[in-house]
């Protein structure tokens, strides 16, 4: 996003939050700012094109901004590295509303209210995120990402995913094996989560 785009975005979000304050809703309103997909493949960052953006199974294709304003839960200004998925939104809204979903309702996500409060049990935090488009699948944790083509990347050292980590790397083997084991749980012929959706370009990477 250009500096001009960031300025416009910041102003509009600030205006929305300010309106809630004027209406006296600040103490009981949750504001979530996010996006529905990664950066546009035709976009630029600091004058350089985005690598593997929207529509592609790469971190920059699925990783989106996620900013939450919840003054009744925390003072704000906190940056969290917790892995959050869109499936977590519904359970979170139910949690804040004090609604307990029926046991017969299967939910893929979980409430991230503990993360907002800053008291999430480290042993209960999500440790990986799975994504799929067509027959192309990938899984990532906080720092690494692997796909069903065998490509493994260190997102801290290589956010553009241009350098594949060698299987002989002394630091990464444990991470690679763990993520590969989780990815292997999904059958190779597993259908997309939404069978009614058929990607025009399945398997872009």
Predicted regions and their residues:
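Short small-residue beta-strand/loop micro-motif enriched in glycine and branched aliphatics
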Residues: 74-78, 160-164
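Non-transmembrane alpha-helical segments in soluble domains
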Residues: 10-17, 21, 90-97, 113, ...
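Charge-dense polyanion-binding interfaces
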Residues: 172-194
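C-terminal cap/loop subdomain of S1 sulfatases and analogous C-terminal strand-loop tails that border
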Residues: 39-52, 56-57, 75, 82, ...
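Histidine-centered active-site microenvironments of extracellular/periplasmic hydrolases
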Residues: 18-73
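A long, amphipathic alpha-helix that forms part
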Residues: 1-29
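Substrate-binding clefts and catalytic carboxylate motifs of secreted carbohydrate-active enzymes
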Residues: 181, 202-204
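Soluble non-cytosolic domains of exported or imported proteins
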Residues: 3-10, 80-87, 106, 170-173
């Amino acid at each position: 996003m250009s500096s001009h785009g960031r300025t416009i975005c910041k102003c509009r979000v600030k205006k929305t939050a300010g309106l809630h304050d004027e209406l006296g809703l600040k103490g009981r309103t949750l504001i979530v700012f996010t996006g529905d997909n990664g950066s546009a493949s035709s976009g630029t960052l600091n004058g350089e094109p985005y690598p593997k953006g929207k529509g592609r199974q790469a971190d920059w294709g699925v990783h989106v901004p996620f900013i939450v304003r919840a003054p009744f839960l925390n003072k704000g200004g906190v940056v969290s590295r917790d892995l959050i998925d869109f499936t977590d939104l519904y359970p979170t809204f139910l949690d804040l509303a004090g609604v307990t979903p029926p046991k017969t309702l299967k939910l893929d996500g979980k409430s991230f209210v503990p993360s907002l409060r800053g008291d999430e049990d480290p042993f209960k935090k999500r440790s990986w995120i799975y994504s799929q488009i067509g027959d192309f699948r990938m899984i990532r944790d906080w720092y690494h990402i692997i796909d069903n083509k065998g490509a493994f990347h260190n997102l801290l050292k290589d956010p553009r995913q241009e350098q594949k980590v060698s299987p002989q790397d002394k630091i990464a083997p444990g991470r690679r094996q763990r993520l590969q084991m989780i990815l292997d749980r999904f059958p190779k012929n597993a259908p997309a989560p939404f069978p009614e959706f058929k990607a025009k370009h399945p398997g872009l990477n």
